[in-house]
Amino acid sequence: MADPRQEFDTMEDHAGDYTLLQDQEGDMDHGLKESPPQPPADDGAEEPGSETSDAKSTPTAEDVTAPLVDERAPDKQAAAQPHTEIPEGITAEEAGIGDTPNQEDQAAGHVTQGRREGQAPDLGTSDWTRQQVSSMSGAPLLPQGLREATCQPSGTRPEDIEKSHPASELLRRGPPQKEGWGQDRLGSEEEVDEDLTVDESSQDSPPSQASLTPGRAAPQAGSGSVCGETASVPGLPTEGSVPLPADFFSKVSAETQASQPEGPGTGPMEEGHEAAPEFTFHVEIKASTPKEQDLEGATVVGVPGEEQKAQTQGPSVGKGTKEASLQEPPGKQPAAGLPGRPVSRVPQLKARVASKDRTGNDEKKAKTSTPSCAKAPSHRPCLSPTRPTLGSSDPLIKPSSPAVSPEPATSPKHVSSVTPRNGSPGTKQMKLKGADGKTGAKIATPRGAASPAQKGTSNATRIPAKTTPSPKTPPGSGEPPKSGERSGYSSPGSPGTPGSRSRTPSLPTPPTREPKKVAVVRTPPKSPSASKSRLQTAPVPMPDLKNVRSKIGSTENLKHQPGGGKVQIINKKLDLSNVQSKCGSKDNIKHVPGGGSVQIVYKPVDLSKVTSKCGSLGNIHHKPGGGQVEVKSEKLDFKDRVQSKIGSLDNITHVPGGGNKKIETHKLTFRENAKAKTDHGAEIVYKSPVVSGDTSPRHLSNVSSTGSIDMVDSPQLATLADEVSASLAKQGL
């Protein structure tokens, strides 16, 4: 087991990431603590795929304690669960669960020691994760004491689970969905619980554990935070978690209550935490959730948070869930933990479905753990459904956690986080090779204690499911390369999986929790192209260069001295004596401007004979306005000779209407001869008036008609006659 521990420590190199993942996923509580080898399931169905059983093959304090934890049974669970019964409104932090070292914290102590050594930030991460999970959960935070109690009861719950190994196996195997991950995760939970139990029972045990406990206190704080996260969201999945069906928790809680009646505290725990199924569910989810996601998403994925919730809600709930798992596990464990079942995430989903089909309880538990797995898959691409490739975090996690198997669920996540997911089979194979090289360090067996055969068994089981291009190791072969691949050190299958995850699987497995840090040799995934580039070309005979005529700059020109040698530049002086220099040329150098023989002669022009134009030089002396120039204006007298027209200048003096000029108007009087068209019996004789100053202009002398009327005598008639004549005249008569 020491070797797995060492490998875990090696993983601790990634511990920062790993711790973060654990805190987020509750892996610190379960994964790290679960990583201690799980005692072989009572039902005898050890997870061939989970390295937990392999790790368990070597008895460890945790292994020994795990049965004890199981034996503690409901009574011990109840006793251990006093803290477990934490008001839902109280968070793990409020309960102080994170402060007091939990069994899970102790179990996580392996990781904690490594963390303490180089991963103190991880504790901060755990706290941060805790807070984050709590805030994410939105559920009331439990006091630190309560959290510890809750997390510890989780350890107690694992004890109950240990009682009913079927449940523990079920937990190990995880939700059937995540046969590889879920199994590892469930096993990891059990182992975590066992580790917690071992820590509780033997906190004073090996100094490594004792020393781990202080360091674990921080991881426990992380665990507590996980618990707090779990507690904070008893019914709510964490951020990354996939929401479970509304009736899912009720079903799981019913199953958990049915199985929990064994322990006095189980009933209350279940009552207080119907999310207990979530606890188991969370554990499985952790197992199934790739560490990459944990590391990448510093926040706890919904599944890890749920596991933490389950833990926080109370170990009693965890116990109930585990008890339910114990009852239900027989069906589920085979489904999740069957060595023959492929570890591929998709197979895990199938396993989850199969486990649900197998038993109503299994279905519930599968829902409890499997929904978390489902949640994890939805949030985490590393889940089996997401990645069947060996690079997937699950396969990487499982192979790397033969010793980690106790923590299969948790370690797979870490492993997946550690393991970069490279899809190329060549890369995976290269990683396998690197893992073989690193087997002593970390990849061969994240936990040195875990036998390669055990790892090979779990790996072989999981690898087929993963459909990893790397060769599947037979159960007994225990190929370290696969473990390395799975561990995720360089396994290309797990995309985005930090190398730290692979370490995590190795850490949780050793029950001794030795803080030995195995130098983690991280072999970057070797791509086929890289190997090709390394290939050396066959030696080719050197061409005969003696007969080859070289180009410029070739060997023939090596002796050539550029710019020197025979080439001579002769400067000949030109005889310029006969050359006439231009102005400013060399001949004129001696010329002193403005001096010497050169003279500019200004000859005045004789202008005496020139007659200047007006304004020219000759007129300079002219004074305008003076002299002989005279302007004469002569007026022409046209009046004498010209007769002006009417209105002309001559008629200016004419006064209209005056003078001797008269205007005569002649009036035509045709009416005198005119007759009316219609003879109305009266002849109107109209006489043009005689213009005279005495008489009216118009005078009717007589009117010839019957009974002629004298117009003069009757002025009215005369007026009437005038009017009639005027009207007729207008009409043109």
Swiss-Prot record:
One of its GO terms (biological process) is regulation of autophagy. The modification N6,N6-dimethyllysine is found at residues 455, 603. Residues 1-16, 157-172, 270-294, 354-366 have a biased composition (Basic and acidic residues). InterPro entries: MAP2/MAP4/Tau, MAP_tubulin-bd_rpt, Tau. There is a cross-link at residues 33, 546, 551, 559, 573, 590, 603, 609, 613, 623, 635, 639, 645, 661, 667, 677 (Glycyl lysine isopeptide (Lys-Gly) (interchain with G-Cter in ubiquitin)). Tau/MAP repeats lie at residues 536-566, 567-597, 598-628, 629-660. Disulfide bonds join 583-614. The keyword S-adenosyl-L-methionine does not apply. GO terms for molecular function: DNA binding; enzyme binding; microtubule binding; protein kinase binding. The modification N-acetylalanine is found at residue 2. Interacts with MARK1, MARK2, MARK3 and MARK4. Interacts with SQSTM1 when polyubiquitinated. Interacts with PSMC2 through SQSTM1. Interacts with FKBP4. Binds to CSNK1D. Interacts with SGK1. Interacts with EPM2A; the interaction dephosphorylates MAPT at Ser-369. Interacts with PIN1. Interacts with LRRK2. Interacts with LRP1, leading to endocytosis; this interaction is reduced in the presence of LRPAP1/RAP. Promotes microtubule assembly and stability, and might be involved in the establishment and maintenance of neuronal polarity. The C-terminus binds axonal microtubules while the N-terminus binds neural plasma membrane components, suggesting that tau functions as a linker protein between both. Axonal polarity is predetermined by tau localization (in the neuronal cell) in the domain of the cell body defined by the centrosome. The short isoforms allow plasticity of the cytoskeleton whereas the longer isoforms may preferentially play a role in its stabilization. It is linked to May be involved in the pathogenesis of cytoplasmic inclusions (as Mallory bodies) in livers of mice chronically intoxicated with Griseofulvin or DDC (3,5-diethoxycarbonyl-2,4-dihydrocollidine), a model for human alcoholic hepatitis. Alteration of Tau (abnormal phosphorylation and cross-linking) could contribute to Mallory bodies formation and disturbance of microtubule function in alcoholic liver disease. This is Microtubule-associated protein tau. The lineage of its organism: Eukaryota, Metazoa, Chordata, Craniata, Vertebrata. The gene is Mapt.
